Structure formats: C-alpha cells, structure tokens
Design a protein with these regions (language model features):
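Conserved N-terminal beta1-alpha1 strand-loop-helix module at the mouth
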Residues: 1-105, 110-117
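Short beta->alpha connector loops
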Residues: 62, 124-126
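Small/polar loops that bind or transfer phosphate-bearing groups
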Residues: 96, 122-123
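Catalytic cores of alpha/beta
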Residues: 119, 126-131
C-alpha cells in the first residue's frame, strides 16, 4: 500500500532537519555525549502508579491554529513545565518538531531541567540520530 503523500512530506522534512543537525554535530559525537547523560526518568512507572496518571504536552504552536502566544521563549517553556508539574502532572511530553509546532530540542532540555518528572520527546522519529 503506498504511503500517503502528507506522511512523505513530513518524513522528508524530518530527514532534512536531521541531516542539518548531523552536519553540525556528527553522530559519533552525539553517541559519545549520550554516555554522559543523566539516567532517564521512568515514565512507565509514573504511568502505572495507583490512581489516575496525568500526561501533558508542551508545544509552542498548533498547525491549524498558529502560535501559542505565552510560549515565546525557553524561559516560558521552563516556567510552564514547572507549573504543570506543580499542578500534578506525572509525565510530560515536549513537542520538538520545528516545522509544524515550532518546537526544539532546547525546549525539551529547558523543560526537563525545570521538572523532576519523566519527559518524553514528541516528534516524528525516523533516524537513529534522533534517539
């Protein structure tokens, strides 16, 4: 069955972004850096805890509605992440897709630094470089 054209367009955009990132920081260096990262926070345990688990998502824009005005800087992303954790969120996703959601890995980093709960990268993952 052929892949829908919209999906091809999205994947092509992600692959172009990955190629640009890899031109700046080679995959070998990314792998080396990953060895020094903090231990991942356990999202599965957070979701399987007794009671109702809450997952939320941070994104700077929505393709059909445009930008979310109050998320205009890394500081605003960090502040929102902190506020959501204080409100009781158990797992937080951060939209890193630049083309449609105006997200970035920097958004993911500042959100993760602002909270103690597990973070999930929300993006189209098509290449080992992205992991």
């Amino acid at each position: 069955m052929p892949t829908p054209i919209a999906v091809d367009h999205l994947v092509a955009g992600v692959l172009a972004d990955v190629a640009a990132r890899e031109a700046r920081v080679p995959f070998k260096e990314v792998k080396a850096r990953s060895r020094d990262m903090d231990t991942p926070r356990d999202a599965a345990t957070a979701l399987l805890r007794p009671g109702c688990s809450i997952i939320t998502e941070i994104k700077r824009a929505v393709p059909y509605a445009g930008e979310i005005a109050h998320l205009d800087s890394p500081q605003s992303v960090a502040a929102l992440a902190h506020d959501l954790e204080q409100a009781g969120v158990h797992v937080m996703a951060c939209q890193t897709d630049r083309r449609r959601f105006h997200g970035s890995l920097e958004d993911m980093r500042v959100a993760r630094d602002a909270v103690d709960i597990p973070m999930v990268c929300r993006d189209i993952i098509v290449d080992p470089y992205q992991i």
